């Protein structure tokens, strides 16, 4: 049986599980690891099939969450970025007793645009799936470029993301395709109405993948959660605005 790559870092008295986004791996947290490690015990994870967690095929969201849960501490703050936000949210929904607080970063409970719901057009996600089989490397690079578009440090941030991808083995096309399928089909809007632990949602004002318009909609749908929009950030606020990002987590921790 395969196991996922999992590293513990830091010495804080509060556990924080960090889950990366599509196509990436746990190295994406490198820029904030030192800062957070002095306040939290960090759990850095490569999701199944990504980075050093090779040997897994495509998974459903439920399967991916179950695999991550096997290694996780009994109690932790769960933070998920983008696709990782769906995994963290699914964990909060299925194992609420193990989730001290939920943090989603540039994530949506429903990434696909639906009637009355802003998001990515399903045909765009479908197009990415098609392009994966045609030109795998270029498709991943295009997706990474979209994540930093519009920020003052867009080029530099895109290079950072690319170096993270290249630092570890590339995921198989099947795994990447499965991740896009999750983004295209999953809808946790109703499920998360029943989650009642502290719940912080962080957004980038300039995010081209997760529109900030969803923030007020979810404020209404999930009144128990709080949202924060980072003004000059796009889809990777922890890379473009690490100090403000870490401060938001510190504030959350002090409120628990």
From Swiss-Prot:
SUPFAM superfamilies this protein is in?
A: alpha/beta-Hydrolases
Top-level taxon = Bacteria
Named in its record, the pathway it takes part in is:
Cofactor biosynthesis; biotin biosynthesis
Does Hydrolase appear among the keywords? yes
Enzyme class of the recorded protein, top EC level: hydrolase
Enumerate the subcellular locations listed in this protein's record, separating them with semicolons: Cytoplasm
Domain (AB hydrolase-1) spans: 15-242
Q: Which parts of the sequence bind substrate?
A: 22, 82-83, 143-147, 235
Instruction: Spell out the GO cellular component terms annotated for this protein, sorted alphabetically and separated by semicolons.
Output: cytoplasm
Among the GO biological process terms of this entry, one is: biotin biosynthetic process
Answer whether the UniProt record assigns the keyword Hydrolase to this protein.
yes
Write down the chemical reaction(s) this protein catalyses: 6-carboxyhexanoyl-[ACP] methyl ester + H2O = 6-carboxyhexanoyl-[ACP] + methanol + H(+)
GO function terms (MF aspect): pimelyl-[acyl-carrier protein] methyl ester esterase activity
Supply the alphabetized keyword list: Biotin biosynthesis, Cytoplasm, Hydrolase, Serine esterase
Give the positions the UniProt entry annotates as the active site. Answer: 82, 207, 235
E.C. number: 3.1.1.85
Record-linked Pfam families: Abhydrolase_1 (PF00561)
What is this protein's function per UniProt?
The physiological role of BioH is to remove the methyl group introduced by BioC when the pimeloyl moiety is complete. It allows to synthesize pimeloyl-ACP via the fatty acid synthetic pathway through the hydrolysis of the ester bonds of pimeloyl-ACP esters.
Report quaternary structure and partners: Monomer.
Q: Which family does it belong to?
A: Belongs to the AB hydrolase superfamily. Carboxylesterase BioH family.
Q: Which NCBIfam families match?
A: bioH (TIGR01738), PRK10349.1 (NF007674)
State what protein this is by name: Pimeloyl-[acyl-carrier protein] methyl ester esterase
The species is Salmonella newport (strain SL254)
Q: Which gene encodes it?
A: bioH
